[in-house]
């Protein structure tokens, strides 16, 4: 990598070409000794914690999703990396789970990192050197939002030219954000 890091990735989906193609619940993370990883980044599935899922009267069982997050926290505790990060939409219910309350975090907007939609995101982390850019709001609009207008809302786009690339962008992390975090971690 540009900064001299060897990158390992883990995902359950082959299309992301991970280093380890496995379910994190089944991954033998103790194959590496504590301290092996300098930085850990986790992007758990956001669908289960989505605020939209909680608008219906039916209560969603979060046991499986919570177990996945607890597994991530277990892995972070085992490796005790210099820096760790876990992201999820700021509007979701992950932040309300008892095991997340009290963990340090920064809220950021993806539009401040080059994307043309806002996607307010909470990043729990232990990096005191990183604060993230100021949120996009009154008196501090990004270049993608002009006064008295709104950002593009990808949630309602279902078909048409460019939708696939937009969806892939929607589930990705802005490269400018990753660059900022890595620079603050060296």
What label would you give each PLM region?
Residues 1-186:
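Conserved active-site and SAM-binding loop architecture
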